[in-house]
């Protein structure tokens, strides 16, 4: 699975979808033009919310052939990697703060033949990633405190994104994908791309207005990248 870095990719976060018709939501967001399906897995312990497990991921896999980007916001993620791989994950991202042996877990994910990602919370320094970049395919920067959708981006995290992009360049790891999650909208999309984001996770800004707006909302995000007048000042 190869993700082209020439243009930013939009990952639709189903955390903001209607869970009562989740399969249909995945199908609709696929047709609307999302590049990636972003799936937040929460355990109610590492983050203050509970979402879905591997059985649900497996049940929606047939509704889309797009990349399934599974973000494990759970303690001891290594215990669940196999289950989510078998459920159809194409990318599995673990939190650096939630795993005592992140390098081992990342190596295990890569050995399954899928992409391995590592994520850090807003309070975690980007320097903590320096030793781990050799072992991951993707870095996910949380622009908000994880657990709930609909939050506003924490401005300092955009500088962190820029710093991580520079760190990746310094280490000559330019194939590593940079993903951002939290408060992504038409007003900050372009600035986040300029700061280094390859994949931008969007939930509320896609789903909130209902199915009829999915395609338009995704197009608006893409078009905002081409305009400079909509940039937020972080």
Please provide the spans of the model-predicted regions.
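N-terminal amphipathic alpha-helix/helix-capping segment at the start of soluble metabolic enzymes
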Residues: 1-16, 23-24, 229-234
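Hydrophobic faces of well-ordered beta-strands that scaffold small-molecule active sites
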Residues: 8-13, 37-39, 60, 68-72, ...
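Conserved, mostly hydrophobic/aromatic
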Residues: 22, 29, 40, 84, ...
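Catalytic cores of alpha/beta
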Residues: 26, 78-86, 124-136, 182-200
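N-terminal active-site wall of soluble small-molecule enzyme domains
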Residues: 41-111
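Glycine/Thr-rich beta-alpha phosphate-binding loop at enzyme active sites
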Residues: 43-51, 55, 122, 130-162, ...
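Glycine-rich phosphate-binding active-site loops on the catalytic face of alpha/beta enzymes
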Residues: 92-100, 140-152, 195-217
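C-terminal helical cap(s) of enzyme catalytic domains, especially alpha/beta-barrels
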Residues: 109, 193, 207-234
